[in-house]
């Protein structure tokens, strides 16, 4: 072989080599900056991620201040090709996503924190959960929980929900992670049932209905307390797990749970919620400053600030990060 062409070929192979995270059966090839946005749309903080029954990937982001287009929900195919987007009304507050098959149709449960609006802070008139079709049509909207005894009737209690989970019977659990720290339970039609938590949590940022045992329970990412809490579906404490680092949310596939830790790593948990592996962990400790910098300063094979994660139907993992210019990574299982 011509030596020049051999060297060129070797260089080309090196250029496309991807960083690898994990080991053994939990080994993944990392594709950072996954997903090709259309002209005029720029990522803000990338928060939530979910997959529908056709394999399409949904991303919720706050929309960058420089972006001409303001759509906060973006849909891609499995190859990262843009399909559609909508949700300008949620710019600034776009946060948690949960996608659920109901009968013959998929529905998106979308959470708006109420942040990022004129006036600053949390604007509770925007804080909500919206159940919508995959085309963005609203089925129902749950706003300030006037029905709950834990919230003042004049609307003055801070309410800033972060994530949502759905029980097998359709009951909705909404985490008020940036507000009063309660978990609000509704039935499948959006009718209030109860609220619980409060001082029991410190930023219940994410949650998952855990059906891996005979008795389903609620797994709560008690973020500021650096722990996982397990509670019954009616709010009774069942146990806790320490040794996590700012846990954000959960997604489960075949008994394995992926949990984004805000402090620069992704964590895998087994059926007993014990740590199996940390992926892409950056131990330099500068993630809070790094998240504000250009993406050229992000480190390949390392996370900055994972905020959302989900498995796809093949066991690959999609990760969204809380960085000001947005970052979506696909971890391809190898």
Outline where the language-model segments fall.
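Beta-strand-rich domains and repeat architectures in extracellular enzymes and scaffolds
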Residues: 32-66
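Blade/loop signatures of beta-propeller domains
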Residues: 15-31
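Surface-exposed loop and turn segments in beta-propeller and other repeat-based domains
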Residues: 35-39, 86-90, 139-156, 193-200, ...
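N-terminal secretory signal peptides and thylakoid transit peptides that target proteins
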Residues: 1-11
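Beta-rich, blade/repeat-based domains predominating
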Residues: 42-53, 90-103, 116, 147-171, ...
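Blade-level signature of beta-propeller repeat domains, shared across WD40, Kelch, NHL, RCC1
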Residues: 305-334
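Conserved beta-propeller blade signature
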Residues: 56-58, 107-109, 172-173, 217-219, ...
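Blade-loop segments of beta-propeller domains
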Residues: 69-102
């Amino acid at each position: 072989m011509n030596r020049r062409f051999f060297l060129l070929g070797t260089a080309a192979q090196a250029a496309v080599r991807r960083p690898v995270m994990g080991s053994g059966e939990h080994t993944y090839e990392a594709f950072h900056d996954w997903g090709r946005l259309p002209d005029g749309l720029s990522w803000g903080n990338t928060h939530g991620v979910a997959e529908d029954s056709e394999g399409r990937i949904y991303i919720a982001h706050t929309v960058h201040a420089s972006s001409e287009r303001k759509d906060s929900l973006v849909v891609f195919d499995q190859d990262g090709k843009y399909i559609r987007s909508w949700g300008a009304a949620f710019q600034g507050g776009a946060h948690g996503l949960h996608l659920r098959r109901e009968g013959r149709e998929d529905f998106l449960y979308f959470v708006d924190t109420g942040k990022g609006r004129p006036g600053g802070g949390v604007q509770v008139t925007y804080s909500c959960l919206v159940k919508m079709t995959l085309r963005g049509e609203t089925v129902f909207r749950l706003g300030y929980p006037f029905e709950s005894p834990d919230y003042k009737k004049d609307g003055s209690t801070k309410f800033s929900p972060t994530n949502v989970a759905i029980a097998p019977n359709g009951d909705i659990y909404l985490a008020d992670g940036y507000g009063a720290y309660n978990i609000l339970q509704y039935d499948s039609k959006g009718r209030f049932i109860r609220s619980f938590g409060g001082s029991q949590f410190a930023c219940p940022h994410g949650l998952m209905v855990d059906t891996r045992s005979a008795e389903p329970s609620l797994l709560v990412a008690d973020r500021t307390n650096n722990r996982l809490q397990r509670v019954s579906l009616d709010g009774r404490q069942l146990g806790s797990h320490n040794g996590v680092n700012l846990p954000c949310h959960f997604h489960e596939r075949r008994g394995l749970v992926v949990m984004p830790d805000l402090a620069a790593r992704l964590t895998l948990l087994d059926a007993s919620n014990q740590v199996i592996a940390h992926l892409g962990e950056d131990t330099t400790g500068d993630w809070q400053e790094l998240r504000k910098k250009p993406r050229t300063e992000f480190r390949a094979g390392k996370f900055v600030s994972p905020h959302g994660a989900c498995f796809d139907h093949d066991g690959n993992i999609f990760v969204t990060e809380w960085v000001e210019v947005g970052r979506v990574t696909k971890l391809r299982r190898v």
